[in-house]
């Protein structure tokens, strides 16, 4: 028989920097999960990633106080800002442009995000990324 699920916890944690302080500690502590065990497992799995890159994670908590977690790809907005070399998007995205990315950069981001996107092929994924970039005030050349 499968274990009884008591809840899901969604967090965004910087790669390799999970520690028991908020938001990780309180979120896991409420469900009675072993915080240090999660931190060690998460940091081990994000070892190969760029340090500090926010990684969305979905933790499944079970009734016997055990857990499993699934890591997602970093948010598209973070990858777009990194590619465009800007700190934040525009406050008026359709009038003030803060940067630009090329189609090649958009394709690279789309390849990274492909497991989490609903796009059928790479071209559709690139258009999705281009739309996200435009809504941040970043132009996409060649799309």
Swiss-Prot record:
<comment type="subunit">
    <text>Part of the ribosomal stalk of the 50S ribosomal subunit. Interacts with L10 and the large rRNA to form the base of the stalk. L10 forms an elongated spine to which L12 dimers bind in a sequential fashion forming a multimeric L10(L12)X complex.</text>
</comment>
<dbReference type="GO" id="GO:0003735">
    <property type="term" value="F:structural constituent of ribosome"/>
</dbReference>
<dbReference type="Pfam" id="PF03946">
    <property type="entry name" value="Ribosomal_L11_N"/>
</dbReference>
<dbReference type="InterPro" id="IPR000911">
    <property type="entry name" value="Ribosomal_uL11"/>
</dbReference>
<dbReference type="Pfam" id="PF00298">
    <property type="entry name" value="Ribosomal_L11"/>
</dbReference>
<protein>
    <recommendedName>
        <fullName>Large ribosomal subunit protein uL11</fullName>
    </recommendedName>
</protein>
<keyword id="KW-0488">Methylation</keyword>
<keyword id="KW-0699">rRNA-binding</keyword>
<dbReference type="InterPro" id="IPR020785">
    <property type="entry name" value="Ribosomal_uL11_CS"/>
</dbReference>
<keyword id="KW-0687">Ribonucleoprotein</keyword>
<comment type="function">
    <text>Forms part of the ribosomal stalk which helps the ribosome interact with GTP-bound translation factors.</text>
</comment>
<dbReference type="InterPro" id="IPR036769">
    <property type="entry name" value="Ribosomal_uL11_C_sf"/>
</dbReference>
<dbReference type="InterPro" id="IPR036796">
    <property type="entry name" value="Ribosomal_uL11_N_sf"/>
</dbReference>
<dbReference type="InterPro" id="IPR020783">
    <property type="entry name" value="Ribosomal_uL11_C"/>
</dbReference>
<keyword id="KW-0689">Ribosomal protein</keyword>
<dbReference type="InterPro" id="IPR006519">
    <property type="entry name" value="Ribosomal_uL11_bac-typ"/>
</dbReference>
<dbReference type="GO" id="GO:0070180">
    <property type="term" value="F:large ribosomal subunit rRNA binding"/>
</dbReference>
<dbReference type="GO" id="GO:0006412">
    <property type="term" value="P:translation"/>
</dbReference>
<dbReference type="InterPro" id="IPR020784">
    <property type="entry name" value="Ribosomal_uL11_N"/>
</dbReference>
<dbReference type="GO" id="GO:0022625">
    <property type="term" value="C:cytosolic large ribosomal subunit"/>
</dbReference>
<keyword id="KW-0694">RNA-binding</keyword>
<comment type="similarity">
    <text>Belongs to the universal ribosomal protein uL11 family.</text>
</comment>
């Amino acid at each position: 028989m499968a274990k009884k699920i008591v809840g899901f916890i969604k967090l965004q944690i910087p790669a390799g920097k999970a520690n028991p302080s908020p938001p990780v500690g309180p979120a896991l502590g409420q469900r009675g999960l072993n915080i240090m065990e999660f931190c060690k497992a998460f940091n081990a799995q994000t070892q190969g990633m760029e340090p500090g890159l926010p990684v969305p994670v979905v933790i499944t908590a079970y009734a016997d106080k055990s857990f499993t977690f699934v890591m997602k790809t970093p948010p598209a907005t973070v990858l777009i800002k990194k590619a465009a070399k800007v700190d934040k998007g525009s406050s008026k995205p359709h009038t003030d442009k803060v940067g630009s990315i090329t189609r090649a950069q958009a394709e690279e981001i789309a390849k990274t995000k492909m497991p989490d996107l609903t796009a059928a092929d790479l071209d559709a994924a690139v258009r999705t990324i281009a739309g996200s970039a435009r809504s941040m005030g970043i132009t996409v050349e060649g799309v």
